[in-house]
Amino acid sequence: MEKTFFMIKPDGVRRGLIGEVLQRIERRGFTLDALQLVTPSREHLDEHYHQLKDKAFYPGLIDYMMSGPILIGVISGNEVIESWRTMMGKTNPKDAAPGTIRGDFAQAPDENGEMMNVVHGSDSRDSAKREIELWLGHLTAENK
């Protein structure tokens, strides 16, 4: 059974979308293996977004991600990584199809180019393992 890391970002938590997102996960037939509401630290965010540190939008991204609590968790199921990414929709809300989480709930980039796109999901088994270990290290991060 494949596992992946997911996150409901500060805008999703603030707008009361936790129940909607979790309901979509469960209706899809995936299992919620872990859930935790956390206030992210700068250190966790720097590690999580390490590949984006040189981007011009990075400071705004970190400010956004530290603007409130996030819900983090692990979901499992057959081909859950690819399926969850499809359920989320394209990163940019303007490109996300209706019926996806981002298509239905995310907000277009503001005048500073900052997106509030509600959710995150690992993009590969390696990323899932790394992100589960980073955020929920007390759990097993094995992806069989």
From Swiss-Prot:
GO aspect biological process, one term: GTP biosynthetic process
Provenance organism: Streptococcus uberis (strain ATCC BAA-854 / 0140J)
GO molecular function, one term: nucleoside diphosphate kinase activity
One family name in Pfam for this protein: NDK
Family named by the database record: Belongs to the NDK family.
UniProt xrefs under PROSITE patterns: NDPK_LIKE
Highest taxon in the source lineage: Bacteria
Presence of the UniProt keyword Kinase in the record: yes
Cofactor names: Mg(2+)
Keywords noted in UniProt: ATP-binding, Cytoplasm, Kinase, Magnesium, Metal-binding, Nucleotide metabolism, Nucleotide-binding, Phosphoprotein, Transferase
Cellular component per GO, a single term: cytoplasm
Subunit structure, interactors included: Homotetramer.
Active site: 120
Reaction(s) catalysed by this chain's protein: a 2'-deoxyribonucleoside 5'-diphosphate + ATP = a 2'-deoxyribonucleoside 5'-triphosphate + ADP; a ribonucleoside 5'-diphosphate + ATP = a ribonucleoside 5'-triphosphate + ADP
Location relative to the cell: Cytoplasm
Residues holding ATP: 9, 57, 85, 91, 102, 112
Protein name from the UniProt record: Nucleoside diphosphate kinase
EC number: 2.7.4.6
HAMAP family hit by this protein: NDP_kinase
Coiled-coil regions listed in the entry: none
Role summary: Major role in the synthesis of nucleoside triphosphates other than ATP. The ATP gamma phosphate is transferred to the NDP beta phosphate via a ping-pong mechanism, using a phosphorylated active-site intermediate.
